[in-house]
Amino acid sequence: MSDISRRNFLKTTLGMGAAAVASGVLNAKDRKPESAPNILFCIADDWTWVHSSIEGCEAVETPNFDRVAKKGVMFNNAYCSAPSCAPSRASILAGRNGWELEEGAVLWGQFPAKYKVYPEILEQHGYHVGYTGKGWSPGDIEDSGRTRNPAGKEYNEIRQRPWTEFGVTDEMFDVDYAANFDAFLKDRKGDQPFCFWLGTIEPHRAYAEGLGKRRGKDPKDVNVPDFLPDTPRVRSDILDYLSEIEWVDIQLGRVLDTLEQKGELDNTLIVVTSDNGMPFPRAKANLYEYGTHMPLAICWGNEIKGGRRVDDLVNFIDFAPTFLEAAGVEVPEEMSGQSLMPQLLSKRSGQIDPQRNVTFTYKERHAWSNPGGLATPMRSIRKDNFLLIWNLRPERWPAGHEVPEFNWDMWPFGDVDHGPSKEEVLACKYDEKKRKYYDWAFSKRPEFELYDIAADPYQLNNLARDPKYKKQRESLFRNLKQYLTKTGDLRMQGRGEVYERTPYYCTQGLETGGLWLKEFQGLNRKEREKAYQDARDQLEENLQKLHEITEEARE
């Protein structure tokens, strides 16, 4: 395909929406304002696509996610733009690839106000807009030039502490998502359509270690991905993660019940997904499947035929155009995403649009995890069953530097959230039989990685240097560069420093005394000296723990 701009090669899908109208389904563009649907966008934090009961995961129960999927459409191939919270969410809100958003391309940075977001557009067209939990985050809203979170007006005042019944004490976010949603609904005027963003903090780390076992889960039911060592501690850690997914599902159920009680369920376009993959080594903050492949279920009363599975490759940049089209609002030309209405309005399962066989993902700076906060830029193209990853700076550590001092949390490899599974993989460094797990997660990678997704579901067999796949690699790389160039990737313009110079507002480890950037900047010299000493003490504590982990592995 010589021209792979998604805006160009996906325009043909609009004709499929017309076909849906001919079959008796109302096209969103023909809607009158008074018939505009409500929009409920539910997004979890760090949930990989395979972990739901409808996908066959025996160790987790997600009846409410399954309910949405069965009532509507399950998307088998949905991808985030970036496997990192803030840039993934920015791409959803703006309908653009993260690399198009300048400072919005990174974690703990900014999201410039010049970029339009769909909640603001809908609000201008009469929608009641708000969010609870985690909206666009983490980053600095004020320095972005915004007066509020781009997800809408905040509804986080109502708190809850029912966790003891769930088996934890204080590891979960204490916002009552459903109660705040109800408060949001009470604020709207009459039958005003609403657009609400429900962002759960779960299943983001940290977890209450052993939660899954305390809830009666059996470690034997866990399917340990091949890129992780199969140890009791890893199995227990995965159970804890799955338990938090169940907590998310419970909150989803409460919100669905609220809609049903108010008679709004059938007039609400409901989307359930996650921002990026599970917080484990070689998953989150990576462009492999477990980092970018997301759960996605969408239902909309009787407007769409339910019980279907769609194979089209879709990207999070497609959400904003979908919501705007559903509301009968013109989609801004600068949005790179394409509406999912043809897929939703179709009566069929499987591949709806044959041209939706390609998608793109990226990574820039995730955590402060290399000297000076340097990024580990990556770009990828998934086309049909092949995934090509381009590591633009292969000399840099892909998961953060191995030296703890250079990382935000003063642990090695700071792009990987710390927890039991990370410690288990760190311990593999000195075990000859298990060293592969360490290398897969942390070691430097070649410039190109090529994987056959169907034959290699965990992306462990790099085909990039295999002569048999040379033409495949070259074709994919050509398509990738064409798309990056057409969509204004600053790396293709020699301006990658824009992504790297953005302030990192979280702690920069020793550089900010273990404090968040603005907090550190407000200290006097004496206070900074104390912060530096506290950070050095924390570093020593981490180094001692790291020594214990590695020594135990050597024995």
Protein language model regions, located:
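Short, charged, surface-exposed hinge/linker loops at domain edges
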Residues: Q493-C506
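Formylglycine-dependent sulfatase
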Residues: S2-E449, P457-R478, Q482, M492, ...
